[in-house]
Structure formats: C-alpha cells, structure tokens
C-alpha cells in the first residue's frame, strides 16, 4: 500500500462521444486559420467572410463576390454553358472536372457577366478557387477574353477578381496560350480608352499573376493575399537566400510599387465606385472622339 503512493498514476482524457459531436451540426462553426478563433459561421458570413477577431479574409466563392460588389439583381451572366473538354486526353481529367462541377455547381473556374455598381454598368469576371484551384484552362481564358470583348463593345469598364493557382497543367500549351489571348484582348480594350481594374485575391499565382492579373489600369488586392509567380521554396532554392517573411503578400507588393492599393473587403465596393465615378467623364469623352 505504501508502495502505491509513489506509483505515477496514469492520466486519462475524456474523448467526446459521437453523440456529443453531433450536437453541433457541420457548418455551424468556423475556425479562423490565422488567429484560430472559433466563430459562428453566420457571423463570419455577415461580415463578408472576414474574421471578426483578426481581420483575416476567408476565400469567397464567385457568387458571394458578385453579391458583395454589384447592385442587387443587376447581374447577367455570360457563357454559362461553356465547359472544358480533354483535348490532350490527360488521365482522369474529365472525372476531376465533373467532380468539381458537382461540388461547386459551376461549369468552370470563372464566372463572367455584366452588372451595375451604383447604377454604373461594368463587365466583371470572378475566378473561383474551388474549381480546379482556379486554374486557367482554355475555357477560363476564352470566357475572360469574351468578357473583355463585350466590355469593349459596350464601351464600359472591365473588372476582374483573380484567385488562381496558375495555368492548368492538364491542358498543357493550350492553357499557356490563354495568357497571350487574354492580354491581347485587354490591350485592344485599353487602346480604345477602356478602363480595366484588376483585384487580386488569395491566391493569385503562376500564369494568371504573370498575365492579365498584373496589367490593370488599377491593380488592387485584398489584405494578406498571396501574389506571385513561382513558389517561395523554389525561389529560395534558386537565389540561395532567405526571403522576407511577408514576401509575395499584398502588403509587400504595395510597398515595392507593384500594387496601387490594398483594399479591405468592407471597402471594396465603395473603392470601385469611386474609381468608376472618376473615370466616367474622361472615359466617355475618349469613346466618343
């Protein structure tokens, strides 16, 4: 008995039963990946998917983004039925596309169309990273190019929200061609006096960051967005140097002159409205000359 006093007792942890776990339905709570605070999902959604504790910007899907910037009921979608095929017969590509269509209820990684911001007509494209990580394949490039051409025809500004892992590897050179195609369409729009606003969200990388995302008349970004071409580890191994902690963040790019502004999501619609308002007179004068 005396010996038992000196024996280290085992510590046990209570493991929640399945019944306890089921008391909180899926989707009710959201954990912030930055500050780790657990919040009611409805509270996060009400705050435009921005953490109420630390300001972290959670990813938005395409429809949430459109709802946050456009006048209610003003959006009209373009090219909704366009879908990707498998021209290079890449293994399992069709199955992955179909899986993403079911998961996201989208046909591709970008939604394009027209709508109004404070009654000012714009053509808008919004990339959705849930679909193949927002990668740019031939259909994504085609939809963006067509949207730019529509903005040119309507003589209205073009706005894009980017969120992409870059070119889509399953489409090879056909994917890389979209970098040139979209850039040429934007050049035509620009030469005619058209306004182009690019808003980079997390993440904007690879061929998307190296093409249309970076050539706006105004280049904006959301706080903390990862923006860059190659990955951090690849660059460090190439230059054999340790990169700054904030390298490839929106704030780093702003400090080094690659962005015009970092705009909080709460202020995005108003910032776009002000830019559009400033360019209304000048832009129309160019179109009509």
Curated annotation (Swiss-Prot):
Signal peptide: none annotated. Disulfide bonds: none annotated. It is an enzyme of class 2 (transferase). Its EC number is 2.1.3.15. It holds the Pfam family Carboxyl_trans. A zinc finger (C4-type) spans 32-54. One of its GO terms (molecular function) is acetyl-CoA carboxylase activity. It is found in: Cytoplasm. Its cofactor is Zn(2+). Keywords: ATP-binding, Cytoplasm, Fatty acid biosynthesis, Fatty acid metabolism, Lipid biosynthesis, Lipid metabolism, Metal-binding, Nucleotide-binding, Transferase, Zinc, Zinc-finger. Zn(2+) binds at residues 32, 35, 51, 54. SUPFAM superfamilies: ClpP/crotonase. One of its GO terms (cellular component) is acetyl-CoA carboxylase complex. Binds 1 zinc ion per subunit. Acetyl-CoA carboxylase is a heterohexamer composed of biotin carboxyl carrier protein (AccB), biotin carboxylase (AccC) and two subunits each of ACCase subunit alpha (AccA) and ACCase subunit beta (AccD). This is Acetyl-coenzyme A carboxylase carboxyl transferase subunit beta. It comes from Bacillus thuringiensis (strain Al Hakam).
